[in-house]
């Protein structure tokens, strides 16, 4: 990166400024000093884009699943399909699990397409296990599905659903790791912990760039599962607006 190149240039300049008499040893010319670079993660050709691409994959998975699932359920509600289902003896929990199962299959398929396209066509390097990459992206997709279904209950039109994007999706761009937040206050950075994409971004970065395994990503996986569980419960409660039992 540009920062690494500047640091290397500064070190080279320091070596060149060493007085000649300090480079002498017992009257003989000392061997020329050399600087060897070793990269903990990545290599000399790695760029900032390589660093954020794992997070971008998670972001695209979240964004498309959130938008499609929210609008799909909204259409069923505005066209009366949901009301006809609620008129039956089916429980609210069964309705929610049915929607999650149906749209979940579509979300998983969409996630597989995004991940495999990124890895095999865009040639994104994966240092760790691809199975962890798939699992993390499937979890963020299911979290986006549950959040999208919940948010759609507050929208009365597709336009209103789109208006939720700045509230739900855009903040995650800032707090997921796509934009460095090292210089901001700690309390502002802490806001990012309420967004699922932050945990997905951390886990994907650990697997795809650092090659780490379960012992480094288990906490992020647990948090993503909690997001899915919490918003599934909120969806069941949210259907009380349309039916009390």
Mark where each language-model region is:
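Short, solvent-exposed coil/turn segments
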Residues: 28-30, 66, 168, 216
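Transport-system extracytoplasmic interface segments
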Residues: 1-56, 60, 64
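Juxtamembrane loop-helix boundary motifs flanking transmembrane segments in multi-pass membrane proteins
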Residues: 37, 41, 45, 73, ...
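Sterically constrained small-residue positions within well-ordered secondary structures
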Residues: 26-28, 75, 230
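Residue-level signal for pocket-adjacent positions within structured domains
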Residues: 30, 35-36, 68, 121, ...
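Membrane-spanning alpha-helical segments of multipass transporters and channels
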Residues: 105, 109, 115-119, 125-245
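Hydrophobic alpha-helical transmembrane segments of multi-pass membrane transport proteins
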Residues: 42-120, 172
């Amino acid at each position: 990166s540009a920062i690494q190149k500047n640091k290397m240039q500064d070190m080279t300049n320091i070596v060149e400024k060493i007085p000649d008499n300090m480079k002498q040893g017992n009257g003989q010319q000392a061997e020329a000093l050399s600087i060897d670079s070793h990269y903990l993660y990545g290599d000399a050709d790695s760029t900032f884009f390589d660093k954020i691409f794992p997070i971008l994959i998670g972001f695209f998975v979240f964004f498309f699943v959130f938008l499609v699932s929210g609008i799909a359920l909204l259409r069923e509600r505005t066209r009366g399909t949901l009301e006809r289902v609620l008129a039956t003896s089916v429980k609210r929990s069964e309705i929610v699990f049915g929607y999650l199962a149906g749209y979940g299959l579509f979300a998983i398929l969409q996630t597989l397409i995004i991940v495999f396209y990124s890895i095999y066509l865009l040639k994104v390097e994966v240092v760790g296990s691809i199975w962890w990459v798939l699992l993390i992206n499937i979890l963020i997709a299911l979290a986006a599905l549950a959040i999208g279904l919940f948010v759609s209950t507050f929208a009365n039109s597709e336009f209103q659903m789109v208006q939720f994007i700045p509230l739900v999706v855009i903040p995650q761009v800032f707090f997921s790791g796509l934009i460095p937040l090292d210089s901001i206050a700690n309390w502002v950075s802490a806001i990012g912990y309420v967004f699922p994409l932050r945990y997905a971004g951390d886990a994907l970065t650990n697997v795809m760039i650092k090659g780490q395994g379960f012992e480094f990503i288990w906490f992020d996986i647990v948090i993503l599962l909690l997001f899915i569980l919490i918003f599934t419960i909120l969806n069941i409660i949210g259907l009380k607006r349309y039916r009390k039992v």
